[in-house]
Amino acid sequence: MEIKKLEAMIEAILFTMGEAVEVERIASALDHDVDTIRKIIHNMMDRYEGDERGIKIIELDNSFQMCTKAQMYEAIVKIAHVPKKHILTDVLLESLSIIAYKQPITKQQIESIRGVKSDHAVNKLVEYNLVCEVGRMDAPGRPILFGTTEDFLRNFGIASLEDLPVVAPEKVADFKMEAEEEVQLQLDI
């Protein structure tokens, strides 16, 4: 099958699905190997970025999705329903960061790291579809394990969790020292 026809079929699949589609599913549907399909999609991504188009293809973990470019927001908002913007407070961002870096993680483990109850924060993050239940821990009570979602990757503009910034060891030491000082201050009061 020629490249142009494969590109057209990939484009049709991504457009029709409207959500991220695993590269393996695309390859299987087109009866081609995964590496060839991935290479074709990456070439398409480059072309979409270079052209004056309103859409692009993004990569999320091992999946691809067709979506609109951020620059098209002004035109789209005039015709489409504008979804309610979610406000990520410092508490939500802190909890989300812990989940993103430590997943899969239980609510109790999050609370242990934060030092305060995290029910509200985790529930809000689930409501915003940034985190979800990814399983249960094999421990008494079988606590729920949480992890990030594709919406998390999409909203933060990263392709996979490996793209999360690495926290420098000296920063970790600084944060640890600050936390210990804060705990000591609370004990002294």
Swiss-Prot record:
Q: Which of UniProt's keywords are assigned here? A: Cell cycle, Cell division, Chromosome partition, Cytoplasm
Q: Residues of the signal sequence?
A: none
Q: Could you tell me where this protein is found in the cell?
A: Cytoplasm
The alphabetized list of GO BP terms reads: cell division; chromosome separation; DNA replication
- Where primarily located? cytoplasm
Give any Pfam family that matches.
Answer: SMC_ScpB
Q: Which GO terms describe its cellular component?
A: cytoplasm
Instruction: State the InterPro entries in the record.
Output: ScpB_csome_segregation, WH-like_DNA-bd_sf, WH_DNA-bd_sf
Free-text function comment from the UniProt entry:
Participates in chromosomal partition during cell division. May act via the formation of a condensin-like complex containing Smc and ScpA that pull DNA away from mid-cell into both cell halves.
The family note in this entry says:
Belongs to the ScpB family.
The subunit field of the Swiss-Prot or TrEMBL record says: Homodimer. Homodimerization may be required to stabilize the binding of ScpA to the Smc head domains. Component of a cohesin-like complex composed of ScpA, ScpB and the Smc homodimer, in which ScpA and ScpB bind to the head domain of Smc. The presence of the three proteins is required for the association of the complex with DNA.
Q: What's this protein's name?
A: Segregation and condensation protein B
Q: Which organism is it from?
A: Lachnoclostridium phytofermentans (strain ATCC 700394 / DSM 18823 / ISDg) (Clostridium phytofermentans)
